[in-house]
Amino acid sequence: MSRTVQKLISLLWVSLIVSGCKKNDVTPPTPPVVISPPPDLGFKVVGYFPYYRDPATVPDVKFRMTNVVNYAFGIVTPSGSLSINSIPVFTAIIAKAKANNAKIFLSLSGSHTDFKNMAATDAGRRSFIKEVMNAVRSYQLHGVDMDWEFPRTDDGTDATYTALMKELSDSCHRDAKYYITAAVTAGKYAGVIRDAIKNELFNYVDWFNVMSYDDFSTTTPYRHHSDYTLAQVSVNYWTTTRGMPKTKFVLGIPAYGRPSGITQTNTVLSYAAILAQSGSSQSDSAIVTAGGHPSPYMIYYNGQPTVKKKAMLAKTAGNGIMMWEKWHDTHDAASLLKAACDTIGRTY
């Protein structure tokens, strides 16, 4: 073999060795971060469960009727951190929801001032979101619900709310893992609160729990706080006027009644309490008594016929219903949640 050929073979071996070393030393590329919502849940039946209720007083069937349970609340503190109300109740509700195949969310609330201060800076939002996501992972939740009541256009919180929701959405939607929802007003009244909800948010939030109730008056009598007309107004404003995707519209239904033309202090009653005072499940008003008023008064609520109509409206013009709150309902044939589920064909 000639010396030239030997040199060529030697060079070939060196080349192969170097090439092999390079392949072994290459660091695989980092997978791209995917920001995308989790799979859609279809028609939502959302029920809030406040921290001050006893989980044992609400039967399992009420959790089977809902496919999402919002625990109320995780609070933003004056220092901008997260504080979850009543951890023992929280963990009991988590267990009860999961045992009955319902998703469990943490609903975030607090004073407007505390939200405003926390959301005012990048650092404040980043710190709060980090605590929220740590709680979501620690308690193995399925998502979060934002219940800031309410950002406004006249103090700059419309912009900081939008920034907060964008950043929280990105954290929840990282690798399509967690849901994010938000509570908004019925949309009836133009102004600094309604207008603070920017259309941009439709891209960040998986659905909106529209609070189509509490349209009361302390001076005008005979005014229903949550009639069917208000539900229609909510649908028309959010989905038609504003262009919210109907797949993201969830209609709120109250399981309680309010008077009109008198004080709301100690006069608001649960649906169950109204029926206990001989109110009818087939009516939307009743004469009741309560400690906040010296004489019997008229209270306005949603009976089963109205709830059925609202459920059908939500099915045709939206994508879900929400109830505040589970404990207010009865747990028998007169149940409002049962009437809604039976109307939309939800099995439980």
Predicted region positions:
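Conserved, mostly hydrophobic/aromatic
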Residues: 69, 106, 146, 208, ...
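Sec-exported extracytoplasmic/periplasmic mature domains
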Residues: 71-74, 98-99, 133-141, 169-174, ...
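Active-site and adjacent substrate-binding regions of carbohydrate-active enzymes
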Residues: 137, 147-174, 178-180, 306-348
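Glycan-binding loop/region signatures in secreted carbohydrate-active enzymes
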Residues: 65, 246-317, 338-348
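Substrate-binding surface in catalytic domains of secreted glycosidases
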Residues: 46, 78-88, 130, 150-280
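Glycan-recognition patch characteristic of GH18 chitinases/ENGases
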Residues: 29-136, 223-229
